[in-house]
């Protein structure tokens, strides 16, 4: 079998940040890297899960809600994938920065945390998600589209 594109990225050189992973037709996949792979400890699942709920809810309620395809964690627990269509890289970056700021200061009930709404509703960590978001917001605060290339 051929090696898939995501396995051709030099993970030993990746730093925290936000990168354009691939473009397929009109869909852009962003790599929101919160950890240096194989260097830093990976994220905890509860924090990942809560950040996923809050980020997805935020972006799907933004002015770009019709341009959001997907947001979710990487299996390696070193980041997230964010898929969009029909928006610029600058808008995707700003939306990500805004979502992270929203999560870092979030108070209240996390959307979708019940047995009816979520497949693993017991595995959530709001404080952990807030810390992850604040840390990544700090990384991205001066990030530009020029920084988004692997």
Language-model region placement:
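Active/ligand-binding-proximal structured segments within catalytic/core domains
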Residues: 27-60, 70-71
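Short, intrinsically disordered, mixed-charge
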Residues: 53-64, 98-101, 105
